[in-house]
């Protein structure tokens, strides 16, 4: 099977099928480079993998046994929630393949370099998208629907008159500063030639492009608007704490020009999950002649080619010895350059081994922990907002109600993203640690508590929406049952959650009690052994003294 591979010399060996490696593979193969790509895994995707329900449960069991430094898969909590206690298990009742759990969900801007590259490379032929319908951010105990256009800002119930004026003026100032391609025929206000009512903010922005964005915002806005700007418009992460006003404006401009391209929000989400990106690029690479080896039983040894000759077309700078444990076959390939995913370099038990003489340029930076929790709901979400999603939530650190030490992101998926069955919806909560977090267990316990608290807040907000909007005809038409029935269903889910939490606490107490008893028994046993040993030593000592006395008597005699 592998004999033909040994005859060729490859320009590149790419190890890994993560997003970066897949994009490089597609680009290099289109540029006529000969390459071979391998991944020591059961499937494509790296940390962008998707799992169905059964595979997800297997994956969780595997990660319990073996920890990894890959920040995206550090800890995953799979929590299935049934509305009715007498329901059959989800895995038997429904088609488990209709679930797509996305380890590392990714959006793309509707108008950006990423979308242009996907279209130009024709990788978009292999991916289908849906738009994110609403973006919320949590301020105190409320989820605010973030307005982006002039009309949305004016009708927003979440902002007072002064806040509306300031936010609109800020958005217009950013567009005036960054928009070099004015479209007078655009139907979107912010893309036209903008005349500002007040130039003060624009002038301040222009003068202070190199100062920290946070310092600039604190001078001009309240906490609510600052969170809205940084978390939503600028898409802030923990790595953007020191960004300048100029960098912030670039991010916001990128956000704003993508609004109303396909929907009211700028984000597109791939159907079936983020693994579609890597698979589309891998297909594109394969179409242009790349060879792929995806096998979790491969091992590699990489060495310099001592017989390398520059003019020899069949000789590469590196010789890679590969062992296929499944077929029990060994073979060698020649390559001039090697690109490898950092996870293989960071893992001490990596199946990829380098000769000590080879110098490796490792671009890995500080890693973080990421906690993901998945909550699957039956009926409730469907009754309220069927096919209205997906929805995206962002919660800043230290929210007054949630009291979260870490930033929280959440996505609510519906069947229109092909990630859940028709009669279900999926809430995915992701919490990322700070760079200085060095205690994994402490982080996981805190993140778990935060995600459960956030779930309760989501459920309470749904309940409030029902009470507030039920008389609205459009809203009412989405509901299959009456209001009382829906509220009963929500209360039942919350009771289930409380019951589960109580059972977990009791189980934890029981385990701690058993552990304490075991430790006490061990301590008692240890003391008894020590006393026994001490007694034996004393007896031995007494025996020796008696013998000495006897010997002495004998001598005297």
Model-derived regions: residue spans:
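Flavin (FAD/FMN) cofactor-binding core of flavoprotein oxidoreductases
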Residues: 398, 449-497
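Long, low-complexity, compositionally biased polyampholytic IDRs enriched for Lys/Glu and Gln/Arg
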Residues: 498-552
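Short beta-strand to alpha-helix junction loop
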Residues: 102-112, 202-209, 260-287, 293-295
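Mid-domain catalytic core of redox enzymes
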Residues: 267-269, 279-288, 296-448, 453, ...
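Mobile amphipathic helical/loop "lid" adjacent to a hydrophobic cofactor/ligand pocket
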Residues: 82-246
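Conserved Rossmann-like nucleotide-cofactor binding loop
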Residues: 20, 24, 43
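Beta1/beta-strand and adjacent pyrophosphate-binding region of the FAD-binding site
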Residues: 4-20
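Glycine-rich FAD pyrophosphate-binding loop
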Residues: 13-15, 29-55, 64, 74-75, ...
């Amino acid at each position: 099977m592998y004999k033909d591979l040994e005859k060729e010399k490859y320009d590149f060996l790419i190890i890994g099928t993560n997003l970066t490696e897949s994009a490089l593979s597609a680009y290099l193969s289109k540029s006529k480079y000969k390459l071979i790509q391998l991944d020591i895994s059961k499937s494509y995707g790296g940390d962008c993998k998707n799992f169905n329900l059964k595979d997800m449960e297997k994956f969780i069991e595997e990660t319990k046994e073996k920890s990894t430094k890959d920040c995206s898969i550090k800890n995953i909590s799979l929590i299935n929630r049934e509305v009715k206690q007498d329901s059959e298990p989800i895995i038997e009742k429904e088609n488990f393949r209709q679930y797509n759990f996305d380890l590392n969900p990714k959006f793309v801007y509707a108008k950006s370099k990423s979308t242009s590259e996907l279209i130009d490379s024709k990788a978009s032929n292999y991916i289908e998208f849906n738009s994110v319908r609403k973006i919320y951010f949590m301020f105190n105990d409320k989820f605010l629907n973030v307005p982006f256009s002039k009309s949305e800002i004016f009708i927003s119930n979440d902002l007072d008159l002064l806040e509306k004026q300031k936010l609109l003026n800020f958005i217009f100032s950013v567009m005036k500063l960054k928009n070099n391609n004015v479209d007078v025929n655009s139907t979107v206000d912010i893309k036209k030639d903008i005349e500002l009512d007040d130039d003060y903010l624009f002038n301040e922005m222009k003068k202070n492009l190199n100062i920290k964005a946070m310092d600039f915002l604190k001078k001009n806005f309240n906490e609510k608007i600052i969170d809205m700007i940084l978390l939503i418009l600028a898409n802030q992460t923990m790595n953007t704490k020191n960004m300048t006003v100029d960098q912030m404006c670039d991010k916001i401009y990128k956000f704003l020009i993508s609004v109303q391209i396909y929907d009211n929000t700028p984000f597109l989400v791939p159907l079936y999950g983020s693994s579609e990106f890597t698979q589309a690029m891998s297909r594109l690479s394969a179409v242009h002649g790349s060879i792929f080896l995806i096998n979790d039983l491969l091992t590699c040894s990489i060495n310099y080619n001592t017989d390398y000759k520059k003019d020899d077309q069949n000789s590469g700078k590196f010789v890679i010895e590969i062992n296929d444990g499944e077929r029990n076959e060994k073979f060698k390939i020649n390559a001039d350059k090697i690109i490898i995913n950092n996870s293989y370099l960071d893992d001490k038990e990596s199946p990829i081994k380098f000769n000590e003489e080879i110098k490796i340029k490792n671009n890995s930076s500080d890693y973080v922990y990421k906690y993901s929790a998945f909550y699957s709901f039956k009926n409730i979400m469907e009754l309220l907002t069927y096919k209205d999603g997906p929805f995206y939530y962002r919660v800043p650190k230290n929210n007054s109600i949630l009291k979260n030490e870490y930033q929280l992101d959440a996505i609510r998926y519906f069947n229109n993203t092909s990630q859940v069955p028709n009669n279900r919806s999926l809430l995915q909560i992701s919490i990322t640690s700070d760079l200085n977090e060095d205690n994994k267990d402490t982080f996981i316990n805190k993140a778990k508590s935060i995600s459960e608290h956030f779930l309760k807040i989501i459920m309470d907000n749904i309940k409030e929406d029902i009470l507030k909007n039920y008389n609205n005809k459009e809203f009412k038409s989405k509901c299959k049952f009456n209001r009382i029935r829906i509220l009963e269903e929500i209360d039942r889910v919350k009771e289930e959650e409380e019951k589960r939490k109580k059972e977990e606490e009791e189980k934890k107490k029981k385990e701690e009690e058993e552990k304490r008893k075991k430790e006490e028994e061990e301590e008692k046993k240890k003391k008894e052994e020590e006393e026994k040993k001490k007694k034996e030593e004393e007896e031995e000592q007494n025996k020796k003294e008696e013998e000495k006395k006897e010997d002495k008597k004998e001598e005297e005699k």
